[in-house]
């Protein structure tokens, strides 16, 4: 039994089948990239994995239990960062991290922002930051979270090369410590092929 299991998922949108019979199992320490063309259902699949959406058929299990039965404990173990940063634009970068990680002290939050490339921007309201900087505020949570499972939708959008390298290193560290990372990205990952498992949605069944 894996930590996260997908069984025979079916997803239809506007009378079109995005994927059907989709099944896979993820174990501790896995790093997974969901691939496929635009419209293949990558973001839809991520939302199904978070429990934000329900499949038309099939189920997602966490540690052998259907998500709807373990929703609270599952979400305690989940960090989800979608297309939108999901941050409070009227708060500063530092205040955002305090909001999402109330048990993190200021030193930890400042270090997380520095790791994300935001040193010197800690006290600036988020609505005054660029799109890339706002994205970094959300991604700084990767250095604070205790969640086992990270689900990240295009995390490298509007991030420069150095930022992508730092984020990639953080994901590698997380999986080496037994965590799971699931992401979509159009950018090549600068890591050994052997470290990445790819699940393709180029067909109605994942390959």
Swiss-Prot record:
Q: Which UniProt keywords apply?
A: ATP-binding, Cell inner membrane, Cell membrane, Cytochrome c-type biogenesis, Membrane, Nucleotide-binding, Translocase, Transport
Q: Where in the cell is it found?
A: Cell inner membrane
Q: Which family does it belong to?
A: Belongs to the ABC transporter superfamily. CcmA exporter (TC 3.A.1.107) family.
Annotated GO molecular function terms are:
ABC-type heme transporter activity; ATP binding; ATP hydrolysis activity
Q: Which reaction does it catalyse?
A: heme b(in) + ATP + H2O = heme b(out) + ADP + phosphate + H(+)
Organism in which the protein naturally occurs: Escherichia coli O157:H7
The superkingdom listed in its UniProt entry is: Bacteria
PANTHER family from the entry? ABC TRANSPORTER I FAMILY MEMBER 1
The name under which this protein is listed is Cytochrome c biogenesis ATP-binding export protein CcmA
An individual GO BP term? cytochrome complex assembly
Q: Does the keyword Ribosomal protein apply?
A: no
What are the TM regions of this chain, as residue ranges? none
Please describe the quaternary structure of this protein.
Answer: The complex is composed of two ATP-binding proteins (CcmA) and two transmembrane proteins (CcmB).
GO CC, any one term: plasma membrane
Listed EC numbers: 7.6.2.5
* GN (gene name): ccmA
Describe its membrane topology: Peripheral membrane protein
Query: Where in the numbering of this chain does the ABC transporter domain appear?
Result: 4-207
Q: Which Pfam families match?
A: ABC_tran (PF00005)
Residues annotated as binding ATP: 36-43
The entry's function note states: Part of the ABC transporter complex CcmAB involved in the biogenesis of c-type cytochromes; once thought to export heme, this seems not to be the case, but its exact role is uncertain. Responsible for energy coupling to the transport system.
């Amino acid at each position: 039994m894996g930590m996260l299991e997908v069984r025979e998922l079916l997803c239809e949108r506007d009378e079109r089948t995005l994927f059907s019979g989709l099944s896979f199992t993820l174990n501790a320490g896995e790093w997974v990239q969901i691939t496929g063309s635009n419209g293949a259902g990558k973001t839809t699949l991520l939302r199904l994995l978070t429990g934000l959406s329900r499949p038309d058929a099939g189920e997602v299990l966490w540690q052998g239990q259907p998500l709807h039965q373990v929703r609270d404990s599952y979400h305690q173990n989940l960090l989800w960062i979608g297309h939108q940063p999901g941050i409070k634009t009227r708060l500063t970068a530092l205040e955002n991290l305090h909001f999402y990680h109330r048990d993190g002290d200021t030193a930890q939050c400042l270090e997380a922002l520095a790791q994300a490339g935001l040193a010197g921007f800690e006290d600036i309201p988020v609505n005054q930051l660029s799109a890339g900087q706002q994205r970094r505020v959300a991604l700084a949570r990767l250095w604070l979270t205790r969640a086992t499972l990270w689900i990240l939708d295009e995390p490298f959008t509007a991030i420069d090369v150095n930022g992508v390298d730092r984020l990639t290193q953080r994901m590698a560290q997380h999986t080496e410590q037994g965590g799971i990372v699931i992401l979509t990205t159009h950018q090549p990952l600068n890591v050994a092929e052997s470290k990445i498992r790819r699940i393709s949605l180029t067909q109605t069944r994942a390959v």
